[in-house]
Design a protein with these regions (language model features):
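A short, active-site helix/loop in glycosyltransferases that binds the activated sugar's phosphate group
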Residues: 44-45, 194-223, 422
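Membrane-proximal helix-turn-helix segments that form the acceptor-binding/catalytic region
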Residues: 124-128, 150-158, 171, 184-204
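A charged, aromatic-enriched C-terminal amphipathic alpha-helix characteristic of glycosyltransferases
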Residues: 380-427
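Nucleotide-sugar-dependent
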Residues: 257-260, 314, 324-347, 356-368
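Nucleotide-activated donor-binding/catalytic signature segment of Leloir-type glycosyltransferases, i.e.
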Residues: 285, 291-320
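Conserved donor-binding/catalytic core segment of Leloir-type glycosyltransferases
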Residues: 241-262, 266-269
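N-terminal subdomain of nucleotide-sugar transferases
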Residues: 1-83, 223, 231, 270-273
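Carbohydrate-associated surface elements
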Residues: 210, 228-229
């Protein structure tokens, strides 16, 4: 632990839970901190599960609804190790949010923003918490929600302390997959909040080189690229011989039409395996899949759906395979979903020493990065994917890119270098 680092108050949407990959980025960035130097504000009614940070303030959106009808309802509270989670409230909120995410209607986003517009979250408890933790720096996670940007702006004004912003998705440009006039209106107001937050920040962190290029120009800043870092101190590249059947694995969500990519990959594998079992694809996902669709993908026995494994078992599963698949939809309807983003899984895949097979449109940040770094087998179309997989030199390609990917990770995502950059940036901000 480094006692000389400044105290940081982190503002993020979801609960900090180290058992889930979604929280791995925060834990990765701040794991060298003394937990007493960190505090966190979040808006999910769940108990944190992390050893990285001990001090939390939770804003309950269900309580915000109740406050409309009963104004003295408490909407936020400090969370510590003795806190007992309100199961009924947590389940109610989780059920509500799962429904909203499943339906993906802009109407629910609008209702959520209206709820926050009542400002019931600006509680005396929140003000007391911020005063108590007295941070040196505010760390604001970027968000595609106006409400989260409003929360971050409010806290920065409350503390009058310097702050940095970490953008992981394109929250600013008008490049939206589905045309909807209401979404454009929403984006207009989101842009105003994002612009104010970034323009007044001491440092902007971004997730990908493509985002840096665009946002530096838009906001006239010199942003710093920050990805999940990998500890290479005990890692060394171990070459492996590829033998048939080649074992491929996909691990992750299949939302945003990623399932269609896996379906096409499965069809190509089925065609190849007509003359004998040459490739096997394993899929691990937490998402529900219609049984009819699942049956159509697996009917020839070349693709298998597996029960999801805990986050700490992911490395073991990858080690058992030759190729790890990273997929984004090739459907133009979804072309902007990952346009500037960079999945935390990519750094894990590169560090695994296994070949990465990346499938997706050529103009999005992950594909551009892997192509420019020559760190993966990159297929920007199904025809290109088929050419790679039917080629006689596929085993040689896999062995070659397993090494290239590993050393790309060592060069660009070494945790030692990233930790040093973040720590130096934090110290510089405080000294300004």
């Amino acid at each position: 632990m480094n006692q000389k680092l400044p105290k940081i108050l982190i503002i993020t949407r979801g609960v900090w839970d180290d058992s889930k990959g979604t929280s791995s980025t925060l834990s990765n960035i701040f794991c060298n901190y003394n937990p007493e130097q960190l505090s966190c504000i979040y808006i999910e009614t769940k108990k944190p599960n992390t050893k990285i940070c001990n001090t939390f303030f939770q804003i309950s959106e269900i309580s915000l609804i109740k406050k409309i009808f009963k104004w003295n309802t408490k909407t936020g509270q400090e969370i510590n190790s003795e806190y007992i989670e309100n199961d009924s409230l947590a389940k109610m909120e989780a059920s509500t949010m799962n429904y909203v995410r499943h339906n993906r209607s802009f109407f629910y986003t609008f209702l959520r923003e209206v709820l926050w517009a009542f400002n019931g979250w600006k509680s005396k408890e929140l003000k007391a918490f911020v005063k108590k933790v007295n941070p040196d720096i505010i760390w604001a996670d970027g968000s595609p929600l106006i409400l989260m940007n409003r929360l971050s702006k409010y806290i920065t004004k409350l503390t009058r302390k310097p702050y940095c912003v970490y953008e992981m998705d394109d929250v600013y440009t008008y490049k939206i997959s589905n045309y909807n006039p209401f979404r454009y209106i929403y984006k207009y107001f989101l842009r105003k909040n994002v612009s104010q937050l970034i323009t007044n920040s001491s440092q902007l962190f971004v997730i990908s080189p493509k985002m840096k290029t665009e946002y530096d120009k838009i906001f006239n800043v010199n942003s710093k690229i920050l990805t999940k870092g990998i500890d290479y101190s005990d890692k060394e590249f171990k070459p492996y011989k590829v033998v048939e059947p080649i074992k491929m694995v996909y691990m992750g969500q299949i939302i945003y039409d990623r399932l269609s990519v896996l379906q096409e990959l499965g069809k190509i594998i089925d065609d190849i395996n007509v003359v004998g079992k040459k490739i096997q694809l394993d899929i691990y996902t937490t998402n529900h899949i219609d049984e009819e669709i699942k049956s159509s993908i697996t009917r020839k026995g070349n693709v298998k759906f597996n029960e999801p494994v805990p986050y700490d078992m992911v490395t073991k599963v990858i080690d058992e395979h030759d190729v790890v698949v990273y997929a984004e939809s090739l459907n133009k309807q979804y072309e902007y979903v990952a346009r500037l983003s960079f999945s935390t899984k990519i750094t894990d895949y590169l560090a695994s020493g296994k070949c990465v097979l990346a499938i997706g449109p050529k103009n999005i940040a992950p594909m551009e990065y892997l192509k420019n770094e020559d760190a993966a087998i990159v297929a920007n179309s199904y025809d290109e994917l088929r050419r790679f997989l039917v080629g006689d030199n596929l085993p040689v390609l896999i062995e070659e890119y397993s090494m290239k990917g590993f050393y790309c990770g060592l060069k660009n995502h070494n945790k030692k270098d990233i930790d040093k950059m973040v720590a130096e940036t934090m110290r510089t901000i405080v000294s300004i």
